[in-house]
Amino acid sequence: MKKISKLRGMQDIEPLQAKKYDFIEMEFNSISKSYGYDEVRFPILENTELFKRSVGDESDIVNKEMFTFESKSGKSMTMRPEGTAGSMRMAIENGLLDSGQQRISYKGPMFRYERPQKGRSRQFQQLSLEAYGFNAVSYTHLTLPTKA
């Protein structure tokens, strides 16, 4: 019988590595909350059109790097290659921008169909902060640990 292995470029996160991820995520949550960012969560699967519109129909991400497939009903769906487009769609769709300014944080797996190599996988974790509705951009640099 043929051995079943994980797909090329995907990750298994074993207990020791999971503890490191937990530490980094807890630090991210703590720091982002202290700066007024609220955590949000949005789907891993999104309408393909969202990414075509946000990153550009002719971009390498859209043309070469997205995991895209059709549902049984024929709708084109994509596993999120990045988080900004999904977070913006969610904020608009759910009225988070109605009050004017909004700071959000999110984390989770992202997927890009690119050649796996050292330090680059097809599945990767992204931690992000987004600030919407601010007239003047003021940057607060948050330093997060990169090694646990």
Predicted regions and their residues:
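TRNA-recognition modules of translation machinery and tRNA-sensing kinases, especially anticodon-binding
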Residues: 1-142, 147
